[in-house]
Protein backbone atom coordinates (compact mmCIF):
# COMPACT_ATOMS: atom_id res chain seq x y z
CA UNK A 1 0.00 0.00 0.00
CA UNK A 2 1.16 3.51 -0.70
CA UNK A 3 -0.63 6.45 0.86
CA UNK A 4 -0.48 10.14 0.02
CA UNK A 5 0.41 12.34 3.01
CA UNK A 6 -3.25 13.30 3.56
CA UNK A 7 -4.64 9.78 3.00
CA UNK A 8 -6.19 7.50 5.59
CA UNK A 9 -7.59 4.04 5.11
CA UNK A 10 -9.07 1.09 6.91
CA UNK A 11 -8.24 -2.32 5.48
CA UNK A 12 -8.36 -5.89 6.61
CA UNK A 13 -6.99 -9.30 5.89
CA UNK A 14 -8.63 -12.60 6.81
CA UNK A 15 -6.97 -15.97 6.32
CA UNK A 16 -8.64 -19.36 6.71
CA UNK A 17 -6.26 -22.24 7.30
CA UNK A 18 -8.12 -25.04 5.59
CA UNK A 19 -11.86 -25.69 5.62
CA UNK A 20 -12.58 -27.15 9.07
CA UNK A 21 -16.32 -27.71 8.54
CA UNK A 22 -15.60 -29.67 5.35
CA UNK A 23 -12.90 -31.76 7.06
CA UNK A 24 -10.28 -30.25 4.73
CA UNK A 25 -7.47 -29.24 7.09
CA UNK A 26 -4.46 -27.10 6.26
CA UNK A 27 -2.03 -30.01 6.50
CA UNK A 28 0.21 -29.56 3.46
CA UNK A 29 2.07 -26.57 2.09
CA UNK A 30 3.23 -23.15 3.19
CA UNK A 31 1.34 -19.87 3.43
CA UNK A 32 3.27 -16.59 3.14
CA UNK A 33 1.68 -13.25 3.94
CA UNK A 34 3.04 -9.79 3.15
CA UNK A 35 1.45 -6.45 4.05
CA UNK A 36 3.53 -3.31 3.67
CA UNK A 37 3.46 0.46 3.68
CA UNK A 38 6.99 1.19 2.44
CA UNK A 39 9.15 2.77 5.11
CA UNK A 40 6.33 2.68 7.67
CA UNK A 41 5.02 -0.82 8.35
CA UNK A 42 5.94 -4.34 7.32
CA UNK A 43 4.00 -7.46 8.26
CA UNK A 44 5.46 -10.67 6.98
CA UNK A 45 4.48 -14.13 8.05
CA UNK A 46 5.17 -17.68 6.97
CA UNK A 47 3.05 -20.58 8.15
CA UNK A 48 4.11 -24.12 7.37
CA UNK A 49 1.32 -26.69 7.62
CA UNK A 50 3.77 -29.11 9.24
CA UNK A 51 4.58 -26.69 12.11
CA UNK A 52 2.46 -28.34 14.79
CA UNK A 53 3.88 -26.15 17.57
CA UNK A 54 2.83 -22.95 15.82
CA UNK A 55 -0.58 -24.19 14.73
CA UNK A 56 -1.66 -26.09 17.84
CA UNK A 57 0.26 -25.00 20.93
CA UNK A 58 -1.24 -22.47 23.35
CA UNK A 59 1.71 -20.18 22.56
CA UNK A 60 0.85 -20.29 18.86
CA UNK A 61 -2.55 -20.46 17.18
CA UNK A 62 -3.92 -22.88 19.81
CA UNK A 63 -5.75 -24.86 17.12
CA UNK A 64 -7.57 -21.83 15.70
CA UNK A 65 -8.11 -22.05 11.94
CA UNK A 66 -8.60 -18.37 11.14
CA UNK A 67 -6.36 -15.36 11.66
CA UNK A 68 -7.49 -11.88 10.80
CA UNK A 69 -6.34 -8.28 11.08
CA UNK A 70 -7.94 -4.89 10.58
CA UNK A 71 -5.73 -1.85 10.30
CA UNK A 72 -6.12 1.91 10.26
CA UNK A 73 -3.21 3.49 8.39
CA UNK A 74 -2.34 7.07 7.51
CA UNK A 75 0.00 8.84 5.14
CA UNK A 76 1.10 11.26 7.87
CA UNK A 77 1.76 10.65 11.55
CA UNK A 78 -1.30 10.42 13.78
CA UNK A 79 -1.40 12.52 16.91
CA UNK A 80 -1.15 10.61 20.16
CA UNK A 81 -4.74 11.62 20.93
CA UNK A 82 -6.02 10.13 17.67
CA UNK A 83 -4.02 6.92 18.13
CA UNK A 84 -5.50 6.56 21.62
CA UNK A 85 -9.02 7.17 20.26
CA UNK A 86 -8.51 4.42 17.68
CA UNK A 87 -7.15 2.01 20.29
CA UNK A 88 -9.90 2.83 22.79
CA UNK A 89 -12.63 2.36 20.17
CA UNK A 90 -11.18 -0.99 19.10
CA UNK A 91 -10.67 -2.22 22.67
CA UNK A 92 -14.24 -1.27 23.59
CA UNK A 93 -15.41 -3.67 20.86
CA UNK A 94 -12.91 -6.39 21.78
CA UNK A 95 -13.79 -6.32 25.48
CA UNK A 96 -17.42 -7.27 24.80
CA UNK A 97 -16.84 -9.74 21.96
CA UNK A 98 -16.77 -13.55 22.38
CA UNK A 99 -13.26 -13.55 20.84
CA UNK A 100 -11.86 -11.11 23.42
CA UNK A 101 -9.36 -13.68 24.73
CA UNK A 102 -7.81 -14.22 21.29
CA UNK A 103 -7.81 -10.64 20.04
CA UNK A 104 -5.83 -7.51 20.71
CA UNK A 105 -5.23 -3.96 19.53
CA UNK A 106 -1.85 -2.31 19.14
CA UNK A 107 -0.17 0.70 17.59
CA UNK A 108 3.23 -0.34 16.19
CA UNK A 109 4.05 3.24 15.14
CA UNK A 110 2.44 6.64 14.65
CA UNK A 111 0.97 5.72 11.24
CA UNK A 112 -0.67 2.38 12.04
CA UNK A 113 -3.24 0.95 14.46
CA UNK A 114 -3.87 -2.80 14.18
CA UNK A 115 -6.35 -5.27 15.63
CA UNK A 116 -5.52 -8.96 15.34
CA UNK A 117 -7.68 -11.95 16.14
CA UNK A 118 -7.52 -15.74 16.11
CA UNK A 119 -10.81 -17.61 15.69
CA UNK A 120 -12.00 -21.18 15.16
CA UNK A 121 -13.78 -20.14 11.93
CA UNK A 122 -13.84 -17.15 9.58
CA UNK A 123 -17.32 -15.87 10.44
CA UNK A 124 -16.69 -14.89 14.09
CA UNK A 125 -13.45 -13.15 13.10
CA UNK A 126 -15.12 -11.18 10.31
CA UNK A 127 -17.94 -10.25 12.70
CA UNK A 128 -15.35 -8.75 15.05
CA UNK A 129 -13.60 -6.89 12.22
CA UNK A 130 -16.90 -5.40 11.05
CA UNK A 131 -17.60 -4.10 14.54
CA UNK A 132 -14.15 -2.50 14.80
CA UNK A 133 -14.60 -1.04 11.30
CA UNK A 134 -17.88 0.56 12.38
CA UNK A 135 -16.37 1.92 15.59
CA UNK A 136 -13.37 3.40 13.77
CA UNK A 137 -15.51 5.06 11.07
CA UNK A 138 -17.62 6.68 13.73
CA UNK A 139 -14.78 7.67 16.07
CA UNK A 140 -12.09 8.67 13.58
CA UNK A 141 -14.10 10.07 10.67
CA UNK A 142 -17.51 10.86 12.21
CA UNK A 143 -19.13 8.76 9.47
CA UNK A 144 -22.08 6.49 10.12
CA UNK A 145 -21.07 2.85 9.75
CA UNK A 146 -23.25 2.03 6.75
CA UNK A 147 -22.14 -1.42 5.64
CA UNK A 148 -21.37 -1.90 1.94
CA UNK A 149 -24.16 -3.76 0.12
CA UNK A 150 -21.81 -6.63 -0.72
CA UNK A 151 -21.62 -7.50 2.98
CA UNK A 152 -25.28 -8.53 2.94
CA UNK A 153 -24.59 -11.41 0.54
What is the predicted role of each segment?
Residues 13-153:
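A structural signal for small-residue-enriched, beta-sheet-centric alpha/beta enzyme cores
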Residues 1-4:
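Intrinsically disordered, low-complexity linker/loop segments enriched in Gly/Pro
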Amino acid sequence: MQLAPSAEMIGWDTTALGLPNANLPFDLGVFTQHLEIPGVWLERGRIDASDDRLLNSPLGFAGHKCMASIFFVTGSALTRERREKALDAARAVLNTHPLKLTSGATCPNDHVVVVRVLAPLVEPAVNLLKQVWAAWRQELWQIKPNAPRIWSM
